């Protein structure tokens, strides 16, 4: 028997009146006796504070404050303490005989709020000899002690060996340890639990029927069916989780395509870009190598072109030089031809002009004579006309002057003055100072005679001059001819010079006749010389091209050698062409094969990927199609075996679940029909009565009752007899036992207990021997133990079933994968590696291309040699006929000799041609040159002088005529006399004027006639002179030009000059053609060089740029490769089949995937940001980071509880397998988890029945309790009507409300709340949610109503109320209720604490004096029967014969207040022992 724990003592340190006091507590009743203010309540307050150190609950008031809403300000604690550190400790000895000291350290906090600081602590393992006061205080003198602080206490305790000190910051931890050690009856998990415990202690302390407890009896007495409630909550949570899991699975299944899509598109997006960069890197590397090869080749080609350019430039310079010489020669020949043609034309013009000059000379002589005569006549007529004109003018002037002076004197004076002026002018001209108006007429006759004489003398001299001019003209002509031929010669040497010229004339004519033969001979020799020079030039060019000097005699042998070489080179070129054609054909075949393999490679790579995946899945090395088919057969066999094993495991799992379901029935009823029959018979299942049996006693009772362990206990078998008739729905064996279900025991059998077996004597002649079952199932503890085992077994079977299901589906998927592989890839999977063949073919192609390039270079060299040999033979064909000409060494001398003779002949011919006519004319005039007619100049001077005299005579005669005409004017001395004179003069003047005008008219007419005739003669003469002068000048110019031309104009000169020019033109054309060809070749070469240089610069720029790109890309590629390899995604990204797609296709693939990814990750901010960053084309590593982020995101989304891999791709494959299995399993689980409404009603009813039975058992313990007129106390338990209706509907009419319980949108609790509202529409549910109401309806306590009833006097059973009872009766009734609550708590908490722990029972009662002696005795009896401790307080001793009594007296000594305590132990059955303690020294 387990002993109940007991409180041994209470210690107060530094409380008001108690410095260090320990109260030993009695095992039953401890009484505190004393007057008012003695310290009884303080002692009890210290006990309660140590028991419940919660300042939010503690409120110590006296009985006068009962029912008050507020007490003292400090709630009764602050005033009970003294300044400094205070302690309140309880010394407990629990069922394990462990000494435990629990207590609190209290200290007042300064301030108006009068707060108290509390620190709970526990001391374990304290030796029995150590008293609490010794532990908490330190002696400092004989009668003085000091209270230790908490830290000092801790240090002191830790110094003790084996003693533990624990300080708590949480009241929950403090109470949890107290519950585990058996100090308090219930685990106080929360503040509400502490509040209940405190309210119980408070009700016990102040006594009476506590309304706070009676109103909440359900919470105090009825244990919370946390198991059932938790089962419902777990069921709902499991259903909710199951539905959420199913929904998540459905969402996951719907998201599976999204995951696949995300993986596929991310792989396409990143792998396409990854392979595009890999391809571009390979292309860039190949491009860089190709550019480098092109660069080197271009440099070599540029060097060759530069060498060729230098050679062609040198040859062009030579050709240009030769062309310049040829152009000079050609231009000279052309100029010579032009000069010859010009000379011929000049010669013709000279001859024509010489004839014209002879004719013009004759005509000019005749016309000179005619003009001379006409000139004389013209002079005479002019003089006559001039004189007539002067006379008319003078007369008119005189007449005008006279007319003007007719009326004025001035006019006469003017005329007179004019007459004087005319007289002076005449005197001046005639040099006659004595001339007067009277003798003017005389002198006029004289001077007119002089004029006549002068005119006659002039005519005579003119005739003489013309005769002298004829002789003088012949001499001059001859002199001019000599000067023209021989140059400047004196007139005296002219005859001698002319004779010498005429003497040399015949020899020069002979030389001139040899010009044409010499010219023809020279032309032939020059032509031959030019041919020799051309041949020498051709030979030099030939030697220069061949780099060797050859003699003309060696040309024949050289030609034969070149012809043989040309034949061999021609054969080599032909063979090279055939070889080149063969290599090109082979190259085309290789390229065609590479294209075919390139087309096949992606298909083969896809097949290899599929094959590698199959190899990874199977773990086999699949090397042939036969192995694939054999392994596929193995998969079929494995699938069959795994399916069989899975079905076996499923059957075992169903069997275990059936056992679990049977054992999970409430009350232990394995057959649900027994529950129905028990309700029908009004009995209780035997298993339900023994439901609380321990697991240790379960085998005994199971063997004791044997097959009847499933019997129904009924109050009266006779009442059941009639119900058994016609009973069909029942087990095969139905056991019925008569007995009271409330007080049933095992006395119905005679039993002998043996070693792990029992012998049951069911009758005198019938025994039953039953062994203890190996797996007992009798009692809730045994069933729960078995359920734990079955649950563990079910979990193992479920795990095994899940593994087998997964293996089956994995095998099926592997079989499907093999089937797809056989259908799609088997035909090509085991073919040879096309990439290896491509690499070999690429190597061979490179070799062929290099050989072809070398062959092209050799062929080009051979062709050049062939062309050189061909050109050499062509040059030799031109040089061979000229060998004799090249050997002629005297040709140049002969040409020079003939050229000198030709020059002499040409000089003679030019002299004859230039002066032949002059010599012909000079020959007859040679004799004229012997005498020089110098007197011709004297005659010319006389003629000029005669002309001057004749003109002067004419002027003098005219001046005298004017004076004679103005003689009348000299007489104007008198104006009167002058008037008459004027009239006469006017008439005369008019007559004279008329006569003069007539004379003038005749003179003018005659002058006009002679002028016209003279003009005509003069014009003819001028024309002849002009023509003569022009032709003479032209002849001089022509002769000078002919001399300047310096070419002998003959009949053959033009033909020779033209022939020479044509030859030079042909040579120049040939040279120009060659030069143009060289220029074109040079231009083409320069263009080729420029192109090569541009190409070279571009190649260098492109090469260095590409090389820089390659170097730059290498760093980025290294970063990409590090990311790829570090994260293990290279196998996913390096898809070799993508290497056969071009950049545009890969970019298009990546762009399409990017568009799909933007939609796929639009709801994921992280992936959306990473995707946006990955779009930077300059940062390819960000795409890898995005791919890694996608993988990481998917890894995080992998359900590790159902997926066994970290690879999202494999996870998706496993997900497809596992989700299907989980869907089936969870659907089945939901059907199993879904509890029926009838089962819920049965569970609640069974729980209500069990609690009713438990309350009846508690009532049995209170039947003998009596206080005053109260003879008995009991608890009445009733089911609420509305809740009873709900249970009836749940058990019998659930089909009518399946719309609530079959709804997936409602939990069971919500459906239950909806049904309660439907059944009770009149009840207001307030603001509570259906879930809250449903959870309350799942708590059986809400179905019950508890009332305390007392049997009092003649009134019978009455409801226990304070107003209907006396104070003592109320105190006793309240104490009974509290004892019942404590018992209920202990039973409720029995399974929560150790099996060897029985908790302490202690209650309080203040003001116990209100109870009579009988009631006090009842309390003592109750404490004895229930092993309960009780602390009571009263002003006077109460029943000192039992328990322990302390007498408390408060005293004041030297201003120090203390309590004097005297202890007395009960003396009912033993001698009284009186213990008195001395007063404390504060």
Swiss-Prot record:
The domain of life is Bacteria
Where does it primarily localize? cytoplasm
Is Coiled coil given among the entry's keywords?
A: yes
Q: Which Gene Ontology molecular function entries are recorded, alphabetically? A: ATP binding; DNA binding
Localization, per the record, is: Cytoplasm, Nucleoid
What residues does ATP bind to? 34-41
Q: Which Gene3D superfamilies match?
A: 1.10.287.1490, 1.20.58.850, 3.40.1140.10, Immunoglobulin FC, subunit C, MukB, hinge domain
Keyword annotations for this protein, in alphabetical order, are: ATP-binding, Cell cycle, Cell division, Chromosome partition, Coiled coil, Cytoplasm, DNA condensation, DNA-binding, Nucleotide-binding
List the residue ranges of the region (Flexible hinge). Answer: 666-783
A GO CC annotation recorded here is:
cytoplasm
Q: Which residues form a coiled coil?
A: 337-468, 509-604, 780-805, 835-1044, 1070-1115, 1210-1265
The family database entries (InterPro entries) matched by this protein are listed as:
MukB, MukB/SMC, MukB_hinge, MukB_hinge_sf, MukB_N_dom, P-loop_NTPase
Might you name a Gene Ontology BP term for this protein?
Answer: chromosome condensation
Family per record:
Belongs to the SMC family. MukB subfamily.
Known role: Plays a central role in chromosome condensation, segregation and cell cycle progression. Functions as a homodimer, which is essential for chromosome partition. Involved in negative DNA supercoiling in vivo, and by this means organize and compact chromosomes. May achieve or facilitate chromosome segregation by condensation DNA from both sides of a centrally located replisome during cell division.
Q: How does it assemble?
A: Homodimerization via its hinge domain. Binds to DNA via its C-terminal region. Interacts, and probably forms a ternary complex, with MukE and MukF via its C-terminal region. The complex formation is stimulated by calcium or magnesium. Interacts with tubulin-related protein FtsZ.
Comment on protein domains: The hinge domain, which separates the large intramolecular coiled coil regions, allows the homodimerization, forming a V-shaped homodimer.
Q: What is this protein called?
A: Chromosome partition protein MukB
Organism this protein belongs to: Serratia proteamaculans (strain 568)
Phylogenetic placement of the source organism: Bacteria, Pseudomonadati, Pseudomonadota, Gammaproteobacteria, Enterobacterales
């Amino acid at each position: 028997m387990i002993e109940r724990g007991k409180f041994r003592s209470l210690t107060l340190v530094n409380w008001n009146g108690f410095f260090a006091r320990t109260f030993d507590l009695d095992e039953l009743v401890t009484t505190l006796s004393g007057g008012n203010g003695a310290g009884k309540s303080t002692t009890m307050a210290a006990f309660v504070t140590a028991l419940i150190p919660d300042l939010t609950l503690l409120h110590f008031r006296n009985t006068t404050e009962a029912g008050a809403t507020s007490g003292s300000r400090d709630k009764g604690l602050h005033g009970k303490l003294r300044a400094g550190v205070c302690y309140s400790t309880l010394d407990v000895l629990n069922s394990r005989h462990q000494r435990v000291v629990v207590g609190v350290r209290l200290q007042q906090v300064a301030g108006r709020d009068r707060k108290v600081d509390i620190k709970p602590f526990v001391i374990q393992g304290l030796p029995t000899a150590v008293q609490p006061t010794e532990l908490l205080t330190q002696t400092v003198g004989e009668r003085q002690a000091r209270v230790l602080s908490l830290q000092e206490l801790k240090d002191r305790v830790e110094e003790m060996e084996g003693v533990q000190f624990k300080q708590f910051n949480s009241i929950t931890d403090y109470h949890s340890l107290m519950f585990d050690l058996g100090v308090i009856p219930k685990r106080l998990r929360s503040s509400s639990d502490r509040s209940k415990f405190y309210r119980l202690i408070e009700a016990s302390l102040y006594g009476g029927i506590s309304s706070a407890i009676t109103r909440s009896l359900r919470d105090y007495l009825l244990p919370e069916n946390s198991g059932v409630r938790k089962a419902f909550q777990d069921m709902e949570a499991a259903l909710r989780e199951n539905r959420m899991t199913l929904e998540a699975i459905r969402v996951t299944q719907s998201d599976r395509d999204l995951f696949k899509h995300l993986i596929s598109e991310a792989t396409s997006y990143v792998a396409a870009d990854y392979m595009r960069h890999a391809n571009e890197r390979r292309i860039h590397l190949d491009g860089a190598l190709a550019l480098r090869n092109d660069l080197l080749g271009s440099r070599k080609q540029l060097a060759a072109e530069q060498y060729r350019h230098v050679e062609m430039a040198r040859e062009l310079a030579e050709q240009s030089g030769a062309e310049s010489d040829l152009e000079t020669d050609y231009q000279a020949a052309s100029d010579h031809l032009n000069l010859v043609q010009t000379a011929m034309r000049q010669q013709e013009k000279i001859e024509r002009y010489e004839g014209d000059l002879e004719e013009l000379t004759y005509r000019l002589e005749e016309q000179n004579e005619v003009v001379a005569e006409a000139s004389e006549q013209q002079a005479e007529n002019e003089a006559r006309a001039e004189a007539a004109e002067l006379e008319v003018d003078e007369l008119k002037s005189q007449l005008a002057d006279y007319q003007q002076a007719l009326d004025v004197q001035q006019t006469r004076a003017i005329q007179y003055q004019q007459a004087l002026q005319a007289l002076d002018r005449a005197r001046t001209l005639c040099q006659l100072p004595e001339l007067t108006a009277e003798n003017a007429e005389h002198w006029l006759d004289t001077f007119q005679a002089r004029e006549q004489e002068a005119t006659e003398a002039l005519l005579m001299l003119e005739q003489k001059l013309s005769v002298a001019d004829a002789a003088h003209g012949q001499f001059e002509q001859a002199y001019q001819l000599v000067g023209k031929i021989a140059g400047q010669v004196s007139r005296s040497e002219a005859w001698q010079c002319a004779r010498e010229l005429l003497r040399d004339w015949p020899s020069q004519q002979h030389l001139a006749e040899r010009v044409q033969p010499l010219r023809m001979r020279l032309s032939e020799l020059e032509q031959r010389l030019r041919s020799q020079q051309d041949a020498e030039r051709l030979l030099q060019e030939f030697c220069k091209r061949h780099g060797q000097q050859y003699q003309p005699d060696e040309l024949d042998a050289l030609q034969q050698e070149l012809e043989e070489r040309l034949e061999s080179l021609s054969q080599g070129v032909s063979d090279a062409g055939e070889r080149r054609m063969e290599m090109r054909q082979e190259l085309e075949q290789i390229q065609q094969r590479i294209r075919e393999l390139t087309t096949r490679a992606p298909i083969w790579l896809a097949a290899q990927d599929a094959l590698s995946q199959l190899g990874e899945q199977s773990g086999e090395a699949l090397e042939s199609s036969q192995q694939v088919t054999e392994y596929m057969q193995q998969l079929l066999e494995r699938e069959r075996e795994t399916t069989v094993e899975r079905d076996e495991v499923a059957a075992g799992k169903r069997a275990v679940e059936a056992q679990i379901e049977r054992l999970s029935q409430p009350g232990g009823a394995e057959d649900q029909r027994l529950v129905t029959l028990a309700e029908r018979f009004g009995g209780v299942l035997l298993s339900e009565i023994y439901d609380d049996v321990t697991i240790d006693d379960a085998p005994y009772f199971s063997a004791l009752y044997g097959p009847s362990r499933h019997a129904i206990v009924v109050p009266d078998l006779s009442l059941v007899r009639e119900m058994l008739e016609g009973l069909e729905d029942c087990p095969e064996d139905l056991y019925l036992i008569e007995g009271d279900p409330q007080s049933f025991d095992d006395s119905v059998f005679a039993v002998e207990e043996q070693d792990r077996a029992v012998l049951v004597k069911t009758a005198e002649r019938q025994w039953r021997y039953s062994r203890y079952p190996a797996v007992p199932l009798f009692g809730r503890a045994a069933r729960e133990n078995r359920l734990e085992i079955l649950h563990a077994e079910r979990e193992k079977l479920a795990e095994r079933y899940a593994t087998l299901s997964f293996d089956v589906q994995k095998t099926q998927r592997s079989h499907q994968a093999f089937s797809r592989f056989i259908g799609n890839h088997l035909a090509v999977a085991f073919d040879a590696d096309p990439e290896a063949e491509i690499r070999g073919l690429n190597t061979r192609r490179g070799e062929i291309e290099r050989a072809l390039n070398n062959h092209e270079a050799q062929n080009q060299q051979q062709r050049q040699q062939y062309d050189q040999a061909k050109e050499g033979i062509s040059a030799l064909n031109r040089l061979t006929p000229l060998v004799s000409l090249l050997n002629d060494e005297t040709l140049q001398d002969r040409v020079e000799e003939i050229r000198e003779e030709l020059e002499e002949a040409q000089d003679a011919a030019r002299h004859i041609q230039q002066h032949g006519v002059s010599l012909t004319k000079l020959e007859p005039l040679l004799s004229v040159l012997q005498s020089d007619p110098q007197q011709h100049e004297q005659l010319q001077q006389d003629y000029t002088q005669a002309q001057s005299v004749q003109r002067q005579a004419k002027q003098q005669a005219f001046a005298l005529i004017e004076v004679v005409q103005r003689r009348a004017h000299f007489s104007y001395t008198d104006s009167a006399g002058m008037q008459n004179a004027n009239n006469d003069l006017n008439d005369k003047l008019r007559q004279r004027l008329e006569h003069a005008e007539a004379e003038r008219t005749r003179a003018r007419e005659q002058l006009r006639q002679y002028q016209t005739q003279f003009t005509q003669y003069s014009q003819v003469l001028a024309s002849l002179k002009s023509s003569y002068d022009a032709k003479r000048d032209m002849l001089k110019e022509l002769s000078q030009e002919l001399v300047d031309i310096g070419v002998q104009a003959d009949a053959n000169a033009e033909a020779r000059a033209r022939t020479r020019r044509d030859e030079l033109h042909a040579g120049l054309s040939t040279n120009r053609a060659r030069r143009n060809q060289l220029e074109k070749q040079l231009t083409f070469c320069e263009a080729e060089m420029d192109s090569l240089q541009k190409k070279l610069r571009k190649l260098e720029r492109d090469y260095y740029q590409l090389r820089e790109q390659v170097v730059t890309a290498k760093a980025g590629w290294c970063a990409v490769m590090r990311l790829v390899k570090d994260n293990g995604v290279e196998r996913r990204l390096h898809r070799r089949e993508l290497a056969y797609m071009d950049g545009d296709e890969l970019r298009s693939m990546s762009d399409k995937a990017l568009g799909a990814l933007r939609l796929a990750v639009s709801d994921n901010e992280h992936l959306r940001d990473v995707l946006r960053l990955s779009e930077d084309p300059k940062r390819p590593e960000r795409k890898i980071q995005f791919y890694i982020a996608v993988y990481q995101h998917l890894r995080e989304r992998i359900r590790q509880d159902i997926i066994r891999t970290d690879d999202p791709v494999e996870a998706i494959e496993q997900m497809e397998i596992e989700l299907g299995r989980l869907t089936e399993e969870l659907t089945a689980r939901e059907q199993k988890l879904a509890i029926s409404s009838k089962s819920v009603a049965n569970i609640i009813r069974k729980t209500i029945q069990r609690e009713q039975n438990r309350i009846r058992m508690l009532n049995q313990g209170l039947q003998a309790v009596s206080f005053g007129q109260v003879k008995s106390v009991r608890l009445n338990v009733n089911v609420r009507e509305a809740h009873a209706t709900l249970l009836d509907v749940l058990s019998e009419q659930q089909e009518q409300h399946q719309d609530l319980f079959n709804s997936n949108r409602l939990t069971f609790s919500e459906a239950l709340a909806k049904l309660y509202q439907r059944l009770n529409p009149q009840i207001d549910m307030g603001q509570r949610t259906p879930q809250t109401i449903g959870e309350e309806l799942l708590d059986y306590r809400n179905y019950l109503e508890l009332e305390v009833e007392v049997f009092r006097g003649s009134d019978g059973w009455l409801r226990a109320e304070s107003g209907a009872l006396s104070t003592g009766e109320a105190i006793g009734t309240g104490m009974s209720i509290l004892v019942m609550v404590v018992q209920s708590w202990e039973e409720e908490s029995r399974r929560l604490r150790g099996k060897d722990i029985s908790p302490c029972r202690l209650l309080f009662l203040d003001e116990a004096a209100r109870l009579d002696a009988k009631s006090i005795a009842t309390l003592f009896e109750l404490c004895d029967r229930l092993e309960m401790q009780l602390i009571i307080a009263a002003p006077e001793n109460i029943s000192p014969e039992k328990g322990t009594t302390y007498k408390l007296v408060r005293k004041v000594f030297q201003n120090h207040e203390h309590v004097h305590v005297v202890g007395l132990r009960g003396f009912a059955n033993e001698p009284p022992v009186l213990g008195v303690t001395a007063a404390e020294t504060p």
